[in-house]
A protein has these predicted regions:
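Walker B catalytic acidic pair
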Residues: 121-122
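Flexible, active-site-adjacent loop/turn segments at secondary-structure boundaries
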Residues: 125-127, 135-138, 150, 154, ...
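Generic structural signal for secondary-structure transition and capping sites
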Residues: 89, 115, 145, 202-203
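Conserved core of the PLP fold type I
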Residues: 1-114, 126, 132-140
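Short aromatic-enriched loop/helix-cap "lid" or pocket-rim segments at secondary-structure transitions
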Residues: 129-132, 159-161
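PLP-dependent aminotransferase class I/II
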Residues: 146-204
Length: 204
């Protein structure tokens, strides 16, 4: 919360071995919560691994063009999709920082329907050449429509395959039903090491 403005409790944080695993798990949670598969919008160009994960599990994925402020909300509205996958801190691969105005537009879009969500991939928000980072999109969300995904692979070590997902309360019941089917993909040892690393203040 202190560095990114993310609002959550420990129970809302789901740990997994990489963003791709968490994205597949999230898709199952959304299917459970809404009784069927949802469709996705992705920035164009986009993080290709995430694109191929969603296409590989049979989801409809609509590429949405960018402008100087990030994903075009006008183009997003022209496509009948449920989930917008965005990289607002540093758009991958173009590096665009999504403006506050565009973030609010996205939140408005998501709030217009119960089955709309935003996946915020905050993969490298810790790195900046100048200025303070804009707070995470999740921290601006008042309706529980943003799923925040972060990773320690960029900020600590590439060999540490540990990512995390912050679920809104509205998806926690689905996680309790679906998530318990799977073993955790990150060892308890690695989790405890990172926990101690953060608690001792070395991550700041």
């Amino acid at each position: 919360h202190e560095s990114r403005g993310v609002n959550c409790s420990p129970n809302n944080i789901i740990v997994g071995a990489g963003d791709e695993y968490l994205l597949m798990l999230l898709d199952q949670l959304l299917c459970d919560a809404h009784g069927g598969a949802l469709s996705y919008a992705m920035e164009n160009p986009a993080y290709r691994k995430a694109y191929f994960v969603l296409k590989g599990i049979g989801r409809r994925v609509c590429p949405i063009p960018l402008d100087e402020y990030g994903m075009s909300c006008r183009k997003l509205r022209e496509n009948n999709v449920n989930v917008a996958y965005v990289t607002p801190s540093h758009q991958y691969p173009m590096g665009i920082v999504m403006s506050i105005g565009r973030r609010m537009e996205l939140l408005t879009w998501a709030g217009e329907s119960d089955d709309r969500y935003i996946v915020e991939d905050d993969y490298d928000s810790e790195f900046r050449y100048r200025g303070k980072p804009i707070p995470a999109l999740q921290g601006l969300d008042k309706n529980g429509k943003v799923i925040y995904i972060g990773t320690f692979s960029k900020s600590i070590a590439p060999g540490l395959r540990m990512s995390y997902m912050v679920l809104p309360d509205r998806l926690m019941d689905s996680y309790m039903r679906v998530g318990k089917r799977y073993s955790n993909t990150v060892s308890r040892i690695d989790q405890n090491i990172v926990n101690l690393f953060i608690k001792e203040g070395y991550y700041e």
